[in-house]
């Protein structure tokens, strides 16, 4: 221990950058992988953000990988300064997960949504509606870490995975859902309410599970 302390002191005296640079990198890594606790809102039909970041787009698209319907997609950009842990948008069961190998465009580019390496999740809510969530890599973020398993039951706001460094997360909602955020809003995964589903019996059937998922 004394030898290590002496070596550290000598390094600080002779070449401070030898210690400062690794220490700064270590501090950034620890800060980047932070996972702060979140207060998860309660209430029927509430959908919380699956990621920290900024809402970059809200649009109607054709979701062809899982539900084959027109959906309302909310895109969230995660900078390197955001928490990168992903959280479930609602109480749900994992009914689908698959990874697509692609390119590594900047996560803010429109091409990132369809061309970048990504992992798609299908989360079935208690009323049978499926929420589609995509973890999308970026120019820097090149690794998706899935934590949840197929058929696993998850509570709203529970951690299901992580994307390392700047990236994008998307959530696809039924057209009948009431979106409560706007482009430019900052959101927090697991705590910011981004939408409300219609009451049971009134929700449109555009995101009901396909027969092979039932």
What do these predicted regions represent?
Residues 1-214:
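Contiguous, well-folded functional domains in the mature portion of proteins
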